[in-house]
UniProtKB/Swiss-Prot annotation:
Keywords: Ribonucleoprotein, Ribosomal protein. GO terms for biological process: translation. The keyword Methyltransferase does not apply. Residues 28-62 are annotated as: Disordered. It comes from the Bacteria. The lineage of its organism: Bacteria, Pseudomonadati, Pseudomonadota, Gammaproteobacteria, Chromatiales. InterPro entries: Ribosomal_bL32 (IPR002677), Ribosomal_bL32_bact (IPR044957), Ribosomal_zn-bd (IPR011332). The keyword rRNA-binding does not apply. This is Large ribosomal subunit protein bL32. Belongs to the bacterial ribosomal protein bL32 family. It holds the Pfam family Ribosomal_L32p. GO terms for molecular function: structural constituent of ribosome. NCBIfam families: rpmF_bact (TIGR01031).
Length: 62
C-alpha cells in the first residue's frame, strides 16, 4: 500500500483543491426568439443556432 512520506499541510491541500470550485454555466441568447439557453444546447422553444430543430411541446395551462 502507498504510505505518505509526511503529513500534507493545509496550504498544500488548499492549493490542490483550488481547481475544484464549480463555475457558472456559459449562457447564450437565441437570436431568433431571444431565449436564454446553455451553450451548445437547444432553447426551450426548440431552436438551435437560428433554426427550429424540434417542435416544442404544447403546455396545458390549467
Amino acid at each position: 500500500m502507498a504510505v505518505q512520506q509526511a503529513r500534507t499541510t493545509p496550504s498544500k491541500r488548499g492549493m490542490r483543491r483550488s481547481h475544484d470550485a464549480l463555475k457558472n454555466a456559459a449562457l447564450s441568447i437565441e437570436p431568433t426568439t431571444g431565449e436564454v439557453h446553455r451553450r451548445h444546447h437547444i432553447s426551450p422553444d426548440g431552436f438551435y443556432r437560428g433554426r427550429q430543430v424540434i417542435k416544442a411541446k404544447e403546455q396545458d395551462e390549467e
